[in-house]
């Protein structure tokens, strides 16, 4: 009886998903770290197991080992939440039970503990498990859902004693390889099945997981494939929860030619004279309003699990371009927070000029801030949004 009462008290202490998101001032992604493939392993492999060197996957893509100093630096810069993308498929000790290597799970727990030591919220997901992400087809649906249920049963049981600050996200960018475009009805149906499987199994593990903040995804984490035509089916949570403890996740690198590929150097109305992208503040706020109207109105939280700006500049305009990037960050964070969304900026520790240069902190140089314009804009956005609270 005492155990039951204690469990109920723990569950009652859990905030809703919308409360959880509203408490995130600014979130950061520990990118290109724990979602790496094992050293020497094909990153697109669907193999499940423990290949040689799997315990060293954390550094397989060139980034140094994460330390408590890594987390401390992120917290000191003003972030109070971290998303930890995790690839599990090369750390499975028993593929039939989808059991996770004790070494790998211990390492993930260690990093979570560091985050909690600094009173940061955490998202843990399944990221780059290619057997799951790259096969959104009916021929794989039943097998994948069974494996996903076993995997999340193991993760949820291992992490179930953590308090409300730790949230679970079911999948990542599920898509047919080399096809980021419009999905088929089959692709969408499989993504919806993944989401329901994830919700069912996490709740079934009981304890804190009954009302833990759980995060489900639109296909390829592109909200356009969930906002229209009933493409996204809101999973059914257990009785008594409604939609209160669930968020929908999307990723936002818009407009891509500015945020992702770096072909366009300016964004926003104040920079129109320099050839700014056609997509602007009105585009962004209109899109955010659609998210709030479609999902927020139904009680769901909204998590922008990834967003960012690749560093790109030209000649003598570098300072003005970086000033413009600060303006974008300020606008993005302020508008998202006004609507209660949580946001997690992507940082892959890559620096340079052009596509995929999303580095903010230099992990190879004691977490020195290399993209100060990003931090500046994010902080200004947080301050701006506070005026509307």
Predicted regions and their residues:
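Bacterial N-terminal signal peptides
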Residues: 1-8
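N-terminal carbohydrate-binding accessory modules
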Residues: 11-81
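Solvent-exposed loop/turn segments at secondary-structure junctions
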Residues: 32-36, 81, 87-92, 128-132, ...
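Surface-exposed, active-site-proximal loop segments in enzymatic domains
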Residues: 55, 88-106, 129-144, 176-184, ...
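An active-site-proximal structural segment forming one wall of the substrate-binding cleft
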Residues: 60-82, 92, 96-128, 132-170, ...
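Active-site region of glycoside hydrolase catalytic domains
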Residues: 142-280, 289-310, 338-344
